[in-house]
Design a protein with these regions (language model features):
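Charged helix-capping and loop-helix junction motifs
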Residues: 102-105, 178-183, 236-241
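Active-site phosphate/pyrophosphate- and oxyanion-stabilizing loops and adjacent acidic/basic residues
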Residues: 107, 150-153, 185, 211, ...
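N-terminal membrane-insertion helices
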Residues: 34-45, 180
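Short beta-strands and strand-loop turn motifs
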Residues: 88-91, 119, 165-167, 223-226
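A short acidic, glycine-rich active-site loop
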Residues: 23-39
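Structural beta-alpha unit
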Residues: 6-9, 46-87, 190-238, 242, ...
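Intrinsically disordered or low-complexity boundary/linker segments at protein termini
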Residues: 59, 85-91, 97, 101, ...
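Small/aliphatic-rich secondary-structure junction motif
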Residues: 1-27, 133-197, 219, 247, ...
């Protein structure tokens, strides 16, 4: 369990003569922040231990890690250093303000992580992958999507589920369905035991259309591929994953699309 806390440093923005006047106050603030952070993390650890003891949580090995810095940067740095198989984060889910999307730590990690990220909305009960029966995989017919699909299936081999291949389109196009059908046939040969469906979802209002599809088809997890983009693209043209974490109460699994 990784927690990152941010300690604001005011001294650098103060005139030189005022730094000494604020130094003691700043040190006290930092001490107070550290005490609060340690207390909260210990309380969380005790809560997890209690749930493990009661049998509500599985008896697995875990550690608590505390880091100081900008949350998204420290999470990505820790991931690069320790190479976890997956990063699990929480989101506030549906009906959040769009302006919050700009400063979302989870959204930033999703777009920059090279490790799969599972984002779980706060009001969504999600205890284990054994309960996952239907996964929606969104594809744009990019070769990297196929690689990500392989990664998804190989990672979840011990579990039993079906997959719906989804393509977002502005208008109904027979060619899109033909391509989806071809992808389905390809993966059906690779994974004969896997139940695969495919569908095209209208892209004119894709968030609501996709939400309706998820409800109608009882989708447990939405999966999609993230691609490397520069900072201006991320700010002014938010990707599907960044939009969806604020408009869906379904867990979102994002897999980095590795180049061929």
């Amino acid at each position: 369990m990784l927690h990152v806390y941010f300690t604001p440093i005011y001294a650098t923005s103060l005139p030189y003569g005022d730094v000494f006047n604020y130094q003691l106050s700043d040190e006290e603030n930092v001490r107070n922040i550290l005490q609060k952070v340690h207390s909260d993390l210990n309380a969380l650890s005790d809560k997890v231990k209690a749930k493990v003891t009661s049998g509500e949580f599985p008896d697995i090995k875990y550690t608590c890690v505390l880091r100081e810095g900008i949350p998204e940067e420290e999470i990505l740095r820790y991931s690069k250093e320790n190479r976890p198989r997956i990063i699990i984060m929480g989101t506030r889910g549906k009906n959040q303000k769009d302006i919050d999307l700009i400063g979302s730590v989870t959204a930033e990690v999703i777009e920059r992580s090279r490790v799969p990220v599972l984002a779980i909305p706060e009001n969504t009960p999600f205890k284990e992958f054994n309960a996952v029966k239907r996964i929606a995989f969104i594809t744009n017919f990019d070769q990297r999507d196929l690689i990500a699909f392989d990664s998804l299936i190989n990672s979840l081999k011990p579990f039993c589920f079906s997959v719906s291949l989804i393509h977002l389109a502005d208008v109904k196009d027979t060619w899109n369905e033909i391509k989806l059908g071809g992808i389905k046939e390809y993966f059906q040969k690779q994974y004969p035991q896997l139940e695969i469906h495919y569908d095209v979802v209208k892209n004119d209002d894709f968030l609501n259309s996709l939400d309706e599809y998820i409800k109608t088809n009882h989708i447990d997890i939405i999966t999609l591929t993230s691609y490397k983009r520069n900072i201006f693209s991320r700010l002014f043209n938010p990707g599907i994953a960044r939009k969806m974490i604020f408009h869906s109460d379904t867990p979102l699994l994002v897999i980095y699309g590795r180049p061929n």
